[in-house]
């Protein structure tokens, strides 16, 4: 997973091996070894790679685009998430995945606001978070 994620993220950002290697302070040959799986970076180099590629370290190392719920998508940018697919129930209800509820601090009884854009789709945001954003704009 790591080597595949590293290659796809490097290419997505348009970096050559030499350019990315320079950003993290290693030789092009060392980066090439990371990409072939011949060697693995230490934790500090992983942190530098994740920062340069604008992804979380966890996603850089562990993200599996073929895993259930990732829909075959590449590693999402840092702070962005793929939570998988949820079905709409008979009465229009959806279940928000546990990981999404944890990340966004959503609990039973919270008020959520649904926003829609006919060309983009539907978004969900906690009521208090939207109100805070609106207050800051005043």
Task: Mark where each language-model region is.
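Short, charged recognition helix plus adjacent turn
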Residues: 63-90, 132-134
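Short beta-strand-centered segments at strand-helix junctions
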Residues: 93-104
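DNA major-groove recognition helix of helix-turn-helix
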Residues: 35, 45, 61-64
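Recognition helix of helix-turn-helix/homeodomain-like DNA-binding domains
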Residues: 25-40
């Amino acid at each position: 997973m790591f080597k595949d994620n590293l290659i796809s993220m490097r290419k997505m950002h348009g970096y050559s091996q030499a350019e990315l290697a320079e950003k993290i302070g290693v030789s092009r040959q060392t980066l090439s070894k990371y990409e072939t799986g011949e060697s693995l970076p230490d934790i500090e180099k992983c942190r530098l790679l994740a920062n340069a590629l604008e992804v979380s370290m966890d996603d850089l190392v562990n993200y599996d685009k073929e895993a259930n719920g990732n829909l075959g998508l590449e590693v999402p940018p840092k702070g962005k998430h793929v939570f998988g697919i949820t079905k709409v129930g008979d009465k229009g209800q959806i279940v928000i995945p546990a990981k999404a509820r944890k990340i966004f601090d959503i609990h039973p009884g919270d008020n959520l606001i649904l926003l829609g854009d006919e060309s983009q789709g539907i978004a969900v945001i906690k009521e208090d978070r939207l109100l805070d954003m609106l207050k800051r704009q005043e």
